[in-house]
């Protein structure tokens, strides 16, 4: 099952910025199958990190292709193939979609229970959109990535009437991309933090139990 982002020329309502909260973390491995320049990837990750930071979520990025990767080979390989919902997700940048409309910018893959670890974004479509707006390529790339990762963390039926999770982005959203003003809503932010926080708590309990320490 997939959830995608469509970009067309249609108006949209505004949104409210969400203030920072106590942060939880998520790791996102990025597969640069479209050979996007490293500087563009880095700037897009900074934009996506900003969006998630406003939602109270810290993102750790693991770049799985390109000469600028800094992790050692073994760690690189492990990080790029392992996924753990919802704490470790995979983002793939591909040249174009297969079988989808050219104005679809990305898609997330969810199972019937609403969980999923992989999202794809489509570089050629984003490049084409860049030629029609004043937003930078990295800003569009980062915000599209945030939308698709948002689907993975929010689950099914997670499109919204406004904000970064709106299904159809029009001039208002694109203007907000330019001004770095596109955000998750407070409700969306709380839902994502809750899911990640619960996963962290379960992981700590498992580590505590596996340590064999019984306490007093």
Annotate each language-model stretch with its function.
Residues 1-10:
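Bacterial N-terminal signal peptides
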Residues 9-11, 55, 157:
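Hydrophobic alpha-helical elements and their junctions with loops/disorder across both membrane
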Residues 10-18:
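Boundary at the C-terminal end of the N-terminal hydrophobic targeting segment
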Residues 17-20, 29-46, 107-135, 139-140, ...:
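Metalloprotease/metallohydrolase-associated module, dominated by Zn2+-dependent proteases
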Residues 20-22, 85:
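Solvent-exposed loop and beta-edge segments used for protein-protein assembly and interaction
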Residues 24-26:
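Short structural boundary motif marking the start of a folded domain
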Residues 38-152:
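Metzincin-family zinc-dependent endopeptidase catalytic domain
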């Amino acid at each position: 099952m997939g959830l995608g982002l469509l970009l067309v020329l249609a108006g949209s309502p505004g949104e409210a910025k969400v203030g920072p909260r106590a942060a939880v973390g998520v790791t996102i491995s990025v597969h640069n199958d479209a050979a996007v320049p490293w500087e563009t990837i880095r700037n897009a990750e900074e934009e996506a990190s900003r969006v998630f930071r406003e939602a109270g979520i810290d993102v750790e990025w693991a770049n799985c292709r390109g000469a600028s990767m800094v992790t050692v080979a073994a760690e690189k390989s492990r990080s790029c193939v392992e996924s753990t919902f919802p704490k470790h997700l995979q983002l793939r940048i591909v040249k174009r979609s297969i079988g989808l409309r050219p104005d679809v910018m990305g898609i997330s893959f969810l199972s019937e229970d609403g969980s999923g670890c992989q999202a794809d974004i489509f570089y050629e479509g984003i490049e084409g959109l860049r030629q029609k707006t004043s937003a930078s390529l990295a800003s569009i790339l980062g915000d599209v990535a945030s939308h698709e990762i948002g689907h993975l963390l929010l689950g099914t039926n997670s499109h919204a009437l406004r904000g970064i999770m709106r299904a159809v982005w029009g001039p208002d959203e694109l203007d907000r991309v330019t001004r770095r003003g596109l955000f998750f809503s407070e409700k969306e932010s709380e839902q994502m933090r809750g899911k990640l926080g619960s996963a962290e708590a379960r992981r700590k309990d498992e580590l505590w139990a596996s340590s064999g320490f019984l306490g007093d």
